[in-house]
Design a protein with these regions (language model features):
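Extended redox/cofactor-interaction regions of prokaryotic respiratory oxidoreductases
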Residues: 2-3, 172-243, 248-254, 279, ...
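N-terminal export/assembly segments and adjacent metallocofactor-ligating motifs
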Residues: 2-297, 301-363, 375, 393-394, ...
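N-terminal leader/propeptide and maturation segments of large enzyme subunits in energy/redox metabolism
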Residues: 119-135, 293-403, 586-671, 738-740, ...
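Glycine-rich phosphate/diphosphate-binding loops that line cofactor/substrate pockets in enzymes
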Residues: 137-156, 214-222, 385-386, 407-420, ...
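Conserved short loop/turn motifs at secondary-structure junctions
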Residues: 159-168, 394-401, 424-431, 463-464, ...
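Flexible glycine/proline-rich, aromatic-decorated loop/lid segments
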Residues: 261, 549-582
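Short beta-alpha connecting loops at secondary-structure transitions
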Residues: 266-272, 579-589
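Long, contiguous, secondary-structure-rich segments that constitute the structural scaffold
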Residues: 596-640, 727, 732-745, 749-829
């Protein structure tokens, strides 16, 4: 029996690891590893290559949205170091960070899972016994077959994480084998619902396509705004691009809660109260309108601002005026014909209504209140009404930004463009996140700082756009049988209720088993105590992991997945990296670990679906690349193995250039006719908040004026760490020399008021949970706001866990977890 949680030693001490397995160069790079962990034997190396260093192609596949291309250096059968791979076409994409440099330490970590295990103690106690792969797979298959027979295929749910963004081994990666397994089995999917608001707002306003502006255009911007994100830590590969643009002449401005590295490198720092960025935008827009700095021509030609809205909140269309709608081309996404029924505008030139495409001068103002018997208002008039109450003075009272700075920002966006706006996920982590992003995107549209050279959104994302992902997921069996199709999606916020009550919205939902891969949900989802209840009450939990994560401790069956460099794969997520990255198998899998790809196939075969998994790595990647875009680019499995990287040249450097947005009418959306929430848990929806895409309300707990702040006076945010990505890299011991333990950063005035000194032990708590950690004093920290660098496991905290203090509720329409919208009280221990 193995007791994980009570173990005081993981096989390596820091001293023995550094002495026997690694040497740190002055730059912090791991230059050598040896097999010193118990049970780890050196691989048999080709004697003819003794002492010769081979270089294999690798990719960093964690979810940091960077996707760095790596060289994996192997000597005598062991990985000894990593370096940045060469990208000759665009060398500014060549990067490696401390996490990429420390991959060898992950490979040879004493925290690696070595063999399959079965739980023998209480869930979460970390008590397991060693079993064989045959036993593990047979037990999973027997349980799942029984559940399927008694309760149906939806009694099993997959939680597919984003911790491995690769097609063969990944979870959420486009067209992954895990998604194929789920589709074949008809299992449900538990949605992580992480960092959704940013992408939701962007796709809602600009249409379903990427908006990221390539670094090639950054040097042409007059201003670059880092707004609510921390690229110096969270997106290290991009930070030098910001600084390069600054050197080229762009003024760099950071809008943030706290003083950080980005601020130190910026020309101007605008501190703002937590989650009040939307109020700041309203103040900026108020000044823009007052000064007449809106880009009226852009609004007329490229947005819905001149569209006329009827009393039922739908647009006035030509069919309303007696012109029948027509059938248009088939929508590639839905497979159904589109409907051509043009929206109507008021044409200033002819003083009459016209289809938007035929009007000479679409009017923004001066429009009759009634047209052809319909009472109407243009979208622009409702935008002006929404902004009218938010003077710079009122906005300043809410967001804490001085009036003069609000006016300066208005001049920047309204008069001094082009402006590039950089946002990642920081603003995502509040209950009002969707309204914040809507407002910032509206600011860009109203001032014409998008769809033009060197203007737009710096941080985009989404699919690489080259794959046959649907063909992979729905691949028939070798006998021609079609897969069952995926089961229902379960929103994270609903999981505990389903597990506990065995129903959803009053109807039976007998969920019996959960399968987790590429994720650590205990540490990375909100309201940890509720997460743990879900894992304790689920009948059968299967976890597939590389290390003993917090989630792995709760598994009934624990499957050891190998490291990314121990198997062949392709990194497929694009985000800010427009290249496919081929991952060589540099060494054999250590211990008894197996590639995720093999594990998915083993499970599928044991479940009786072997004919659906009659493919090799080459077969699956080849099918994944069987797409029009890949063919146009000349990318095949063979070519990718040879070149190691492949550029999707169909991805544009400025996708929205010319003001062409990804909607049928080519215009940016500012009004939603039909409000459709992203999730349905029977919640009431106040649609008045959702029609005009320029609305704001305070956060739930981070709001300084929230009633809960009387009981819990401090809001808490959790910034990323330089040495970890979420909880990955927790097991790299020497990286803890840089970030040793969880801490809480306090503003000096707050610390004095609380009687807290540097190094004191403090407890942060609310009604949901608590965490005990060390205090540190930081003058750059905003008053009444505590910053706790996250990514630590529960057992690394003195007591409790940072993840326990967050709540698990969503905005009424957006399925978005709120990691920073949390208030606590502080107790000095």
């Amino acid at each position: 029996m193995t007791d994980i949680t009570s173990s005081k030693s993981r096989g390596f001490t820091r001293r023995s690891f550094i002495a026997g397995a690694a040497a740190l160069t002055a730059a912090g790079a791991l230059s050598g590893c040896s097999a010193t962990a118990k049970g780890l034997a050196p691989h048999a190396a080709d004697s003819s290559k003794a002492g010769v260093e081979e270089i294999f192609s690798g990719a960093c596949r964690s979810q940091c949205v960077q996707g760095c291309y790596l060289n994996v250096h192997v000597r005598d059968g062991q990985i000894v170091r990593t370096t940045a791979g060469r990208i000759e076409e665009e060398p500014f994409y060549e990067h490696i960070c401390p996490k990429g440099l420390s991959h060898p330490a992950r490979v040879y970590s004493a925290g690696r899972l070595q063999y399959p295990m079965r739980r023998v103690g209480e869930r979460g106690a970390g008590e397991f016994e060693r079993i064989s792969w045959d036993e593990a797979i047979r037990e999973i298959a027997d349980k799942w077959k029984g559940y399927r027979e008694e309760f149906g295929p939806e009694s099993i749910a997959f939680f597919m994480g984003s911790g491995n963004t690769a097609v063969l081994g990944g979870g959420t990666a486009d067209g992954s084998v895990m998604q194929h397994l789920q589709t074949v089995m008809g299992a449900c999917s538990v949605l992580p619902d992480r960092d959704i608001a940013f992408q939701s707002a962007m796709s809602k306003m600009f249409g379903p396509g990427g908006a990221f502006v390539s670094p090639k255009e950054w040097s042409g911007a007059n201003h670059i705004v880092i707004w609510g994100c921390n690229p110096a830590v969270s997106c290290k590969r991009m930070m030098h691009l910001y600084l390069d643009a600054k050197e080229a002449g762009a003024q760099l401005t950071t809008i943030d809660i706290q003083y950080n590295t980005n601020v130190a490198k910026s020309d101007w720092y605008v501190p703002v109260h937590p989650a009040t960025d939307g109020a700041l935008v309203f103040g900026i827009l108020s000044e823009v309108i007052a000064q007449g700095w809106q880009d009226s021509e852009f609004l007329r030609a490229h947005t819905e601002a001149p569209f006329l809205v009827k009393e039922d909140n739908t647009f006035l269309r030509m069919s309303d005026l007696g012109v029948p709608a027509k059938e248009g081309p088939v929508n590639a996404m839905t497979g159904k014909p589109t409907v051509i029924d043009p929206e109507v505008v008021w044409d200033e030139a002819t003083q009459s209504v016209k289809p938007y495409s035929e009007a000479e001068m679409p009017a923004l103002e001066g429009i009759p209140g009634e047209v052809e018997g319909f009472r109407i208002r243009p979208v622009w008039s409702m935008i002006l009404e929404a902004i009218s109450a938010w003077t710079p003075e009122r906005a300043s009272e809410t967001c804490g930004v001085p009036v003069e700075d609000i006016k300066r920002l208005a001049r920047m966006y309204g008069q001094e463009g082009p402006v590039l706006t950089g946002m990642n996920q920081g603003l995502n982590h509040y209950f009002n996140a969707i309204y914040t992003y809507d407002a910032i995107f509206a600011l860009m549209l109203i001032t014409g700082n998008i769809g033009k050279p060197s203007a737009g959104v710096i941080s985009g994302g989404g699919s690489f756009g080259i794959s046959n992902s649907k063909g992979c997921i729905n691949q028939p069996s070798s006998k021609g049988e079609k897969p069952a199709g995926p089961g229902r999606n379960i929103n994270w916020t609903a999981l505990y209720g389903i597990v506990h009550d065995q129903e959803l919205l009053g109807k039976p939902f007998p969920l019996k088993s959960l399968y987790c891969s590429c994720t650590n949900i205990v540490s990375n989802q909100t309201e940890q105590n509720e997460t743990i209840k879900s894992l304790q009450e689920i009948e059968f939990l299967v976890v597939q992991e590389m290390t003993m994560s917090d989630t792995a401790l709760y598994a009934d069956i624990l499957l050891p997945a190998c490291h990314w460099f121990e198997c062949e794969d392709v990194r497929v997520r694009s985000y800010n990296m427009p290249y496919l990255l081929y991952n060589d198998k540099a060494i054999e899998p250590l211990y008894e670990s197996k590639p995720d790809f093999d594990i998915y196939k083993m499970i599928g075969t044991a479940m009786g679906f072997g004919d659906f998994f009659d493919f090799t790595e080459k077969d699956y990647i080849s099918l994944w690349l069987d797409s029009p875009v890949a063919k146009k680019e000349g990318v095949t499995y063979e070519s990718l193995r040879e070149t190691k990287i492949a550029r999707n040249h169909q991805l544009k450097d400025n996708p929205l250039l010319g003001g062409k947005f990804f909607y049928q009418n080519g215009r940016a959306k500012l009004w939603t006719e039909k409000v459709v929430p992203e999730y349905n848990l029977g919640q009431e929806v106040d649609e008045s908040k959702e029609h005009l895409l320029l609305y704001w309300e305070p956060a739930r707990e981070a709001n300084l004026e929230a009633p809960i702040r009387e009981k819990y006076p401090y809001s808490v945010l959790g910034e990323h760490m330089r040495t970890r990505n979420h909880t990955q890299w927790w097991d790299v011991g020497y990286m803890k020399e840089y970030e040793r333990q969880p801490v809480a950063r306090f503003n000096p005035h707050d610390a004095k008021e609380l009687g807290i000194a540097e190094g004191d032990t403090v407890r942060l708590y609310n009604d949901r949970g608590s965490v005990t950690l060390l205090a540190t004093i930081n003058a750059g920290q905003a008053p009444k706001t505590i910053n706790c660098p996250r990514s630590f496991l529960t057992r690394e905290h003195i007591d409790g866990d940072f993840a326990t203090i967050s709540f698990n509720d969503y905005n009424q329409v957006t399925r978005n977890q709120c990691y920073f919208d949390q208030a606590v009280a502080v107790e000095k221990l």
